[in-house]
């Protein structure tokens, strides 16, 4: 009995000693493997970095195909499939001057373009030569403040072609426009066809500078042969039979200003908020410069309206053209 009492007392004193020891100093925690692998707390200055295994080494044959950029290399051997092209529009301009003034302006600090077609393009091996001033991957400063459909700032998504041409001169007898040379149009057709094929540019996205900046720009003017360009496989143009049918319809019942306002917007033009004939005039003139160059006064007549709706029918469907008249 006495031995048992001594054992209990000794055990109690030992427990008390351990408890007192625990009060006077924090116990040493044993960190589990899972806790040791946790990421460091936010706010620590030193990030957690790991040391991976041995890096793959390129065989000499593969290594020679790598691109060197400064103090590292790039492997182009794996390609992503989910992407789209920067280029969605082709915009045509004239320079409003001669070769020398065009080159000065387009190689200066304020404006630029991807391609320049000279007044008399040089030839090599029987074929015309165009000047490429900027890589197509780069953003040229050629469209300025611009819009087509829901796209703004078309420098971001377009390739620009400048054609050397004097533009126009105002005279006491009216505005005098200067024509283009046949060899210029031959070269523009070949160049534009190459661009739209490589980037799969929609015909309705081959535009005049005046189309994307109505009222501010008029180039390439009424002498640019858009129909000829279309026949070369580039850009939009209405079918003559469709135009004739719409002319007959509008002779019986012409569209009102609201319907024309909606149709111009549906085609892609940036239109004013209110369907007002005066406010629409610069937009109508831009359309006429492209699709009805024999009459560019900005007034909507039967022929202009017929060409607009014929274009919508051809490229957006007859249902869409009729819907614009019902709304």
Report each predicted region and the residues it spans.
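Short strand-loop junctions, especially beta-strand C-caps/beta-turns
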Residues: 164-166, 211, 272
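Cell-envelope/ECM-targeting effectors and their regulatory/trafficking segments
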Residues: 24-29, 185, 189-199, 215-327
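C-terminal motif of bacterial Sec signal peptides marking the signal peptidase cleavage site
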Residues: 20-22
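Bacterial N-terminal signal peptides that target proteins for export
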Residues: 1-12
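A short, structure-level motif marking secondary-structure boundaries and short turns
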Residues: 176-178, 210-211, 245-246
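Acidic/histidine-rich, metal-coordinating catalytic segments
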Residues: 201-216
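Hydrophobic core
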Residues: 14-18
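Active-site-adjacent loop/helix surface patches within enzyme catalytic domains
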Residues: 30-40, 45-202
């Amino acid at each position: 009995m006495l031995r048992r009492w001594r054992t209990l007392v000794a055990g109690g004193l030992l427990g008390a000693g351990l408890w007192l020891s625990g009060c006077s100093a924090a116990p040493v925690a044993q960190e589990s493997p899972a806790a040791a692998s946790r990421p460091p707390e936010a706010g620590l200055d030193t990030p957690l970095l790991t040391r991976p295994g041995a890096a793959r080494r390129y065989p000499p044959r593969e290594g020679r195909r790598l691109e060197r950029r400064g103090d590292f290399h790039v492997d182009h051997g794996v390609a992503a499939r989910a992407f789209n092209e920067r280029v969605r529009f082709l915009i045509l301009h004239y320079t409003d001057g001669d070769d020398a003034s065009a080159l000065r302006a387009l190689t200066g600090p304020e404006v630029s373009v991807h391609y320049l077609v000279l007044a008399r393009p040089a030839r090599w091996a029987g074929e015309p030569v165009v000047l490429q001033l900027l890589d197509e991957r780069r953003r040229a400063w050629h469209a300025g403040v611009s819009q087509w459909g829901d796209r703004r700032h078309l420098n971001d998504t377009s390739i620009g072609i400048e054609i050397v041409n004097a533009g126009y001169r105002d005279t006491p007898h009216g505005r005098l426009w200067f024509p283009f040379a046949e060899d210029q149009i031959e070269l523009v057709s070949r160049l534009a066809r190459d661009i739209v094929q490589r980037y799969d540019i929609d015909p309705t996205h081959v535009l005049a500078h005046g189309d994307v900046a109505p009222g501010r720009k008029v180039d390439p003017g009424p002498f640019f042969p858009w129909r000829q360009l279309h026949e070369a496989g580039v850009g939009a143009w209405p079918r003559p039979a469709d135009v004739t049918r719409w002319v007959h319809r509008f002779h019986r019942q012409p569209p009102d200003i609201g319907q024309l306002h909606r149709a111009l917007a549906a085609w892609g033009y940036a239109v004013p908020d209110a369907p007002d004939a005066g406010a629409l005039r610069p937009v109508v003139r831009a359309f006429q410069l492209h699709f009805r160059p024999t009459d560019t006064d900005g007034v909507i007549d039967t022929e202009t309206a017929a060409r607009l709706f014929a274009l919508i029918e051809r490229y957006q469907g007859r249902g869409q053209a009729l819907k614009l008249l019902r709304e």
